[in-house]
Regions:
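Divalent-cation
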Residues: 1-134
Length: 134
């Protein structure tokens, strides 16, 4: 399975779903874009991290990072792994120093967590072929 690296291109309110946001990812070495509709709270968490804003109290994704580091777990990468019936699936690839493991997550949560750990975001060709736009 060849992984394709993505980067965040933009985040805006969704034209099609009220109260939702469109997170637009793009191929790092290509022209295709991958739009994903996400919720308001996840969009806020992603935007806060992109803008390097420090909230007064930790958000859920900040808490996850603190907990993971406290117990010796590091996030290695985020993988948007599948698209089934219009729903994206992703994995957070982690390591505890002796073994690597995957956590199933919504892409919005995986990306919010991945941003906090400063890791790369990937997808696979089948997802980009089905949902990607040029």
């Amino acid at each position: 399975m060849k992984k394709i690296q993505l980067e965040i291109l933009g985040l805006s309110s969704s034209q099609s779903q009220s109260g939702s946001f469109a997170l637009v990812l793009g191929e790092k070495e290509g022209n295709r874009r991958l739009p994903i509709i996400i919720g308001m709270f996840e969009a806020q968490s992603i935007a806060i991290q992109i803008e390097k804003i420090n909230p007064n109290r930790p958000l859920t994704h900040d808490l996850f990072k603190s907990f993971a580091l406290e117990v010796g777990v590091k996030v290695r990468e985020v993988l948007i792994s599948d698209l089934k019936e219009g729903v994206f699936y992703s994995k957070i690839i982690c390591s505890n120093g002796t073994q690597e493991f995957e956590l199933d997550a919504r892409p919005s949560d995986a990306i919010a967590i991945g941003l906090r750990f400063g890791v790369d975001i990937y997808t696979v060709e089948s997802v980009l072929s089905e949902a990607g736009i040029i």
